[in-house]
Amino acid sequence: MHVKKGDKVQVISGKDKGKQGVILAAFPKKNRVLVEGVNIVKKHVKPSQANPQGGIINQEAPIHVSNVMPLDPKTGLPTRVGYKVVDGKKVRYAKRSGEILDK
């Protein structure tokens, strides 16, 4: 996958197009990511020990990884991702500016 947990991304298609957020979790086997504040759904929860009231809560749902683009650290604009080897390690870099995305 071209994005990882902690990356700042922008949604490029769907109902939340244009929104930006940080990736909270990545699910590589399903090709989906959980982005903070994006794709909010209402979830009905039964009363339990932790939540005796129960009710309806709003939470993020995963979206397909093809619908997000990482933001370039230099320009703050969405960018495609390239890979190159630096000091024997494969790193991701922003195609827009050439800036390395991996810390």
From Swiss-Prot:
GO terms for molecular function: rRNA binding; structural constituent of ribosome. PROSITE patterns: RIBOSOMAL_L24. The keyword Membrane does not apply. Keywords: Ribonucleoprotein, Ribosomal protein, RNA-binding, rRNA-binding. Signal peptide: none annotated. GO terms for biological process: translation. SUPFAM superfamilies: Translation proteins SH3-like domain. It comes from the Bacteria. GO terms for cellular component: ribonucleoprotein complex; ribosome. CDD domains: KOW_RPL26. Belongs to the universal ribosomal protein uL24 family. One of two assembly initiator proteins, it binds directly to the 5'-end of the 23S rRNA, where it nucleates assembly of the 50S subunit. One of the proteins that surrounds the polypeptide exit tunnel on the outside of the subunit. Part of the 50S ribosomal subunit. This is Large ribosomal subunit protein uL24. The lineage of its organism: Bacteria, Bacillati, Bacillota, Bacilli, Bacillales. The gene is rplX.
